[in-house]
Design a protein with these regions (language model features):
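RNA substrate-binding interface of SAM-dependent RNA methyltransferases
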Residues: 1-52
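Structured adenosyl-cofactor binding patch, chiefly the S-adenosyl-L-methionine
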Residues: 9-23, 80-120
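Short, surface-exposed amphipathic charged segments that create phosphate/polyanion-binding patches used
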Residues: 40-45, 61-65, 105, 109
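Active-site/ligand-binding-proximal alpha/beta "capping" segment
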Residues: 48-99
């Protein structure tokens, strides 16, 4: 799901960069998070933010076994503080020698955590 404001996934450069994967992925665009949440239904939300809880301390016992959404913000600005009230905010801790994580890398780490921790 892509929630506005967001990058234009239909931009020709984006489609070219996907090397054809664009045509094999279902993409849904939403005008707001509220619109997305209404359609997504009952689920857990995990916004990834600098003010979130340490990802490593969050275990399956602390959440029901149901669908969940991993929420990421813009690479330069992240998510608005309003997302602190949405679900369970999490943070990917890293060494002080690392300035920041690229959005793609952060999403990859989070998905690995999700599939490994929750045994999907």
């Amino acid at each position: 799901a892509i929630i506005e404001p967001a990058a234009d996934c239909f931009d020709p450069k984006t489609i070219r960069a996907s090397m054809g994967a664009f045509f094999r992925v279902r993409i849904h665009n939403y005008k707001s998070f509220e619109e997305y949440a209404e359609e997504a239904g009952e689920r857990d939300y995990f916004p990834f933010m600098l003010k979130g809880r340490d990802l490593e301390q969050f275990t399956p016992e602390k959440t029901p076994n149901r669908p969940c959404s991993l929420i990421f913000g813009n690479e330069s600005r992240g998510l608005d503080d309003g997302y602190l009230e949405v679900g369970t905010p999490l943070c990917i801790r890293h060494l002080n020698t690392v300035d920041s994580l690229n959005l793609t890398i952060a999403a990859g780490i989070a998905m690995h955590w999700q599939f490994h921790t929750f045994n999907y």
